[in-house]
Regions:
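Pocket-flanking alpha-helical
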Residues: 45, 63-101, 195
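Bacterial N-terminal signal peptides that target proteins for export
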Residues: 1-11
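Short, well-ordered beta-strand elements
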Residues: 27-40, 58-63, 151-156
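Short, polar/charged alpha-helical segment
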Residues: 39-58
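Bacterial N-terminal signal peptides
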Residues: 9-19
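Ligand-binding pocket segment of bilobal, Venus flytrap-like solute-binding proteins
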Residues: 73, 80-83, 156-197
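Sec/Tat signal peptide C-region and signal peptidase I cleavage site
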Residues: 20-26
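A conserved helix-loop-strand patch within extracytoplasmic ligand-binding domains
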Residues: 102-157
Length: 197
């Protein structure tokens, strides 16, 4: 009898929540989501789109593009939701718009995501590479020869058009690495994944 009461109570609670949810869903309308051309953004956008469509009955429209035009559309109110972005790449544009209350940051969905120049542990240990400045050496650059420009090493960068491509280009110049390395554009997110795997 106790089990039956628990099941009945849970059913009533579930039914009331469903009723509340259904009445809330009626006013959902259209949700305009942004998506980018990298895998983690794709999965985050797909999950949010699924929840909005199937959980709240929203009509979902997804617009895919690169950071600059997508964020400009978001700032202008043409897009409602951006599920993932690389904040460090857009601070100068993002902060004033957020401070003005035009957009709201709801938190971090992928903690500890970092942008940096990486070298595998074996190579770093063997050549005592502890800082990006240790890469500023022609003998070290020769370890990473760029097949398209054998006079330099290759630093695999982001895709041309991604903000981080420009960030990496500037970092190479500031650190003096452009004398020894190319800022290699792998051409696609999949090729970038393969290059760093």
């Amino acid at each position: 009898m106790k089990i039956l009461k628990k099941v009945l109570a849970l059913s009533v609670i579930s039914l009331s929540l469903s009723t509340f949810s259904l009445s809330a869903n009626a006013d959902c309308g259209k949700a305009r989501l942004a998506d980018f051309d990298w895998s983690s953004a794709n999965i985050h956008t797909a999950i949010v789109a699924f929840i909005l469509e199937h959980g709240y009955g929203c009509e979902v429209e997804v617009t895919k593009g690169s950071t600059t035009p997508i964020m400009a559309a978001h700032y202008d109110g043409q897009l409602d939701i951006v599920t993932e972005l690389w904040y460090d790449n857009i601070i100068a544009n993002y902060d004033p718009v957020e401070a003005a209350g035009v957009i709201r940051n709801l938190g971090i969905n992928t903690p500890d995501s970092q942008q940096a120049f990486y070298v595998d542990r074996t190579t770093a240990d063997k050549y005592d590479l502890k800082s990006v400045l240790d890469m500023n050496n022609p003998e070290i650059a020769a370890l990473f020869t760029d097949p398209e420009d054998p006079s330099k090493g290759r630093m695999t960068s982001c895709i041309s058009g991604w903000t981080c491509y420009t960030v990496n280009y500037v970092k190479q110049r500031v650190y003096g690495l452009d004398n020894f390395y190319t800022n290699f554009d792998p051409g696609s997110g999949g090729a970038l994944d393969a290059a760093i795997a």
